[in-house]
Amino acid sequence: MKYQGLLAIAGCIASASAVSVSGAAEGFAKGVTGGGSATAVYPSTTAELVSYLGDSEARVIVLTKTFDFTGTEGTTTATGCAPWGTASACQLAINQNDWCTNYEPDAPSVSVTYDNAGTLGITVKSNKSLLGSGSSGVIKGKGLRIVSGASNIIIQNIAITDINPKYVWGGDAITINNADMVWIDHVTTARIGRQHLVLGTSASNRVTISNNYFNGVSSYSATCDGYHYWGIYLDGSNDLVTMKGNYIYHFSGRSPKVQGNTLLHAVNNYWYDSSGHAFEIGSGGYVLAEGNVFQNIDTIVESPVDGQLFTSPDSTTNKVCSTYLGHVCQVNGFGSSGTFSQADTGFLSNFAGKNIASASAYTVVQSSVPSSAGQGKI
């Protein structure tokens, strides 16, 4: 029996040790290596996970279970506000940095009780690969922060869930700000208080967001309808962002919001089921969208578009892409969705000389992305 036990343990170790980065980043973050060939470590506590992610060593960190941060930093009860009403499906807001006081002075005041761990994510330092084993790697109640000059980071095959979903300003799933060479791949996010993904106002430089499942189903939302509003916010001052192969489901807005000075290549993504809008493009947002599928998205882009947008409207117009991207852009596909037709070409030269993700026909996306995006589908 002792030998059988030892063999079982050895088998588990061998299985765990087999976890490594799958594939390679396409697009702007091509070449990212994360922790490289560092010996994998397997945190067993939330404290170990925080330590591994936040130290100065190159690391491959493998998650084999759920790391639940709920309650680890206590709770706060304070006065917040109800900008969207007090119905049971409406999000309430924490008065973070006097947000309620300054921006929603007429909103009813309410008592809010939130988990402190969720309000600020785990710091991720440079040269890290954070990988999940199978479908078992979950971070619950706290997000990730890639900030302050961090670079060369891979986050792959994990889930981030349940971050104060009732409260705006309750926390973000993934924050990137003042960073470079970041690859977010096969990650599932669900039940998040604020943004599922946010690139802050400092330069995040080269970022690839691929094969992720952004799940906007929530019991609480700013639109009070079960559709999360705060999806993806790209607001950097000098950002090159590739979004490819993502499944963006059940949002009512900001999926994504693009502004600042952000060049976005949105290619082969699947947007499904929105009660509001998908794209919001502000000043300094430059968006090329090709080979995507929009299903049941009544408003694909909110008006007005204050930045620039190329929607790859037809095969003739799309030939202009060849000069700058090295291929003819793919048309997008639509099902029970609104219009999406704009052909600003002045910004396309910004793609010249960059690492550009390949593009497939939208018909491929329709059949493959929902079944292949997110954790455990790698």
From Swiss-Prot:
Top-rank lineage group of the source organism: Eukaryota
Predominant place of localization: secreted
Catalytic residues (UniProt): R254
Pfam families per UniProt: Pectate_lyase_4
GO biological process, one term: cell wall organization
UniProt catalytic activity: Eliminative cleavage of (1->4)-alpha-D-galacturonan methyl ester to give oligosaccharides with 4-deoxy-6-O-methyl-alpha-D-galact-4-enuronosyl groups at their non-reducing ends
Record's signal peptide: 1-18
Enzyme Commission numbers on file: 4.2.2.10
Matches recorded under PANTHER family: PECTATE LYASE 18-RELATED (PTHR31683), PECTIN LYASE A-RELATED (PTHR31683:SF16)
Role of this protein: Pectinolytic enzymes consist of four classes of enzymes: pectin lyase, polygalacturonase, pectin methylesterase and rhamnogalacturonase. Among pectinolytic enzymes, pectin lyase is the most important in depolymerization of pectin, since it cleaves internal glycosidic bonds of highly methylated pectins.
Name of protein: Probable pectin lyase A
Organism whose genome encodes this protein: Neosartorya fischeri (strain ATCC 1020 / DSM 3700 / CBS 544.65 / FGSC A1164 / JCM 1740 / NRRL 181 / WB 181) (Aspergillus fischerianus)
